[in-house]
Amino acid sequence: MRPDVISSFAYNKIMKFTRTKKVLFTNNKGGVGKTTLAFNCAMSFAKQGYKTVLVDLDPQCNLSRLSLGDNRYEKTLFASQEKDVYDVLKGVVEGGADIDLSVPFIPVPDSNNNLSLMKGSVNLSLYENILVTAYGQAAAGQQLGYFQTSAIDRFLRAKGLDDEIDIFVIDTSPSLSLLNQIIFLGADYFVVPMMPDAFSVQGIENLGSIFEKWKQNWKVTGKALSGNTESKFVLSGDGLFIGYIVNSYNVYGKQPIKDHRHWIEELPAKVKKYLSEKHGRNGLVEKSWKTPLAEIQDYGRIPAKCQEIGVAIFDLDPALVEEIHLGTKENIEKSKDEFGILSDRILKILAEY
């Protein structure tokens, strides 16, 4: 194995939690900044000393591109030694083998050696193809179905234990696909990024109801029929909603513009009814809807530049975009505060629940 591949995990440490935490950033609505939020939040975890792995489960691989930067990502596409999530699943998809636990994570720079990536793959669609049959088999209590549907979750659990990972931050495509259903049923927690607009407010009911349907269906079928099946092959289906993020609000005089403020004020009631009360637990029910985990402003062209070179918004050199974006330095400083609040609140929840 190449030294640069294992460098981020080449030392022993005491885990921050009693077990590895799997946090899913999810929304079936595209354009809400889910991938950008996941990356920047994970980088913030890493800089605070949490051993974190980004897991790219979107066949479009946007998280991989953002984490590595355009140039480095494109080089990995043609490097046979660079493994991705499909290499993990290939034996399960093609038959005759199980998940490949030897597939390494790729270190992400500028993270205090605490952040790595499970690179995405366009071939994830091949895994989704077998899920159509596999989920039906698992729902009927058949062993092959459990084996195939649990593949990603088993990989994360095993690597989390072996590599002493504190947090997996998982990104998926903006859809309600069967692949995303399987990922959702394996997650410990989920966060929902939203835009301050009418479409996000309207979409909360649909999203919360579908998540509830997924959980309930699995509870009365695959989980109920699992019998003596080893627990690691049975998805938990108990993902806890820990909060929402208001992303890309526009500012005027350091406050959200009037139209965005209106929709921000509409969100809590919907979140309470369709997400917190259906997918929360104990004291977290109220905490998860009363206020967002964070409000992240629209940073204009800054995120695009960050993707090009593979850095977090708060780590960007202002000189790289100052000529085309006035106020860049001030915005980058503000992003440190906003993502600091977001990561601190999530970490506190992970410690308590």
For the regions a language model picked out, list residue spans one by one:
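P-loop NTP-binding core
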Residues: 2-353
